[in-house]
């Protein structure tokens, strides 16, 4: 069998991935999982034609109205977030309703981090994520964010 010579694979270089765009996504009324998967796709750069898995070519995302995200079904009363304080018997559990009142940005961040690769590249891509309570994002005006409807 003869090898095809006209097939070419384009691989992006790190220098080509320097022009990063920023997007603003409103989480008000959105389902947590669907919102998180779209944000993770943008952070990784999978929405671009030139996507290359080993290059950090994702864009930045600003999520506003984090406290207005919702869950489907009975998860609102059943979902529990666990964390460890570092001390003996330091395992803590916080219900979704308490967490959304105390720290709404953690809920979205936890969901998105679970969808990202657990590598050095994944950790670097998560640094381009900003989650805000409320709809005021004027501190990121210099990035010229594009409002994105997900």
UniProtKB/Swiss-Prot annotation:
The keyword Ribonucleoprotein applies. GO terms for cellular component: cytosolic large ribosomal subunit. It holds the Pfam family Ribosomal_L13. Keywords: Ribonucleoprotein, Ribosomal protein. GO terms for molecular function: mRNA binding; structural constituent of ribosome. InterPro entries: Ribosomal_uL13 (IPR005822), Ribosomal_uL13_bac-type (IPR005823), Ribosomal_uL13_sf (IPR036899). It comes from the Bacteria. This protein is one of the early assembly proteins of the 50S ribosomal subunit, although it is not seen to bind rRNA by itself. It is important during the early stages of 50S assembly. Belongs to the universal ribosomal protein uL13 family. Part of the 50S ribosomal subunit. NCBIfam families: rplM_bact. This is Large ribosomal subunit protein uL13. It comes from Chlamydia abortus (strain DSM 27085 / S26/3). The gene is rplM.
């Amino acid at each position: 069998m003869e090898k095809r010579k006209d097939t070419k694979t384009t691989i992006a270089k790190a220098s080509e991935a320097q022009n990063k765009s920023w997007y603003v996504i409103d989480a008000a009324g959105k389902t947590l999982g669907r919102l998180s998967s779209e944000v993770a796709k943008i952070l990784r750069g999978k929405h671009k034609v030139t996507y290359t898995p080993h290059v950090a070519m994702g864009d930045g995302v600003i999520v506003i109205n984090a406290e207005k995200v919702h869950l489907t079904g009975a998860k609102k009363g059943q979902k529990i977030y666990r964390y460890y304080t570092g001390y003996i018997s330091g395992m803590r559990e916080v219900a979704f309703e308490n967490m959304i009142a105390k720290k709404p940005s953690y809920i979205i961040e936890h969901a998105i981090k679970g969808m990202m690769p657990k590598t050095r590249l994944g950790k670097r891509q998560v640094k381009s994520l900003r989650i805000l309570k409320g709809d005021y994002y004027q501190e990121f005006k210099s990035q010229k964010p594009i409002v994105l409807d997900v």
